[in-house]
Amino acid sequence: MKKVLALITALVLTLAMAVGASASVPDKPSEFAYAYDFDGSVLSSSTKTTIEQYGAALEEATGIQTIAVVVDFLDGEDPADYATDIINSWGVGQSGENNGVVVLLARGDRKIQIGTGTGVDRVMSGAKCGDL
């Protein structure tokens, strides 16, 4: 559990230090990645590489699929709902396990949200995500 929290904390901090799209959830990308920056203006290639490494290590160690998504604005949408919408519409996590995690950065709104599938609660509750 400590390893999971450490990896997710590292992912959150990496994304937060990096400081596009609209409030509607972007279409699911055709190719899987652990980091999505839709207009390419926030995450440097080295930051994306770091996030990819943390995401792969976390999934290998725990089976939990964690992705980072950068958007510009949420246009008033609740960050928790937006992150959950990404989990559900993109199918983040293993089918039937609901063990996906989305680390969402809304750059223009200056918001960071960690959204978790219900299968992640046994490892990391929403309260623990808030502590990060």
Question: What is the predicted function of each stretch?
Answer:
Residues 2-132:
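A structural boundary signal for the start of the first folded domain, especially the loop/turn
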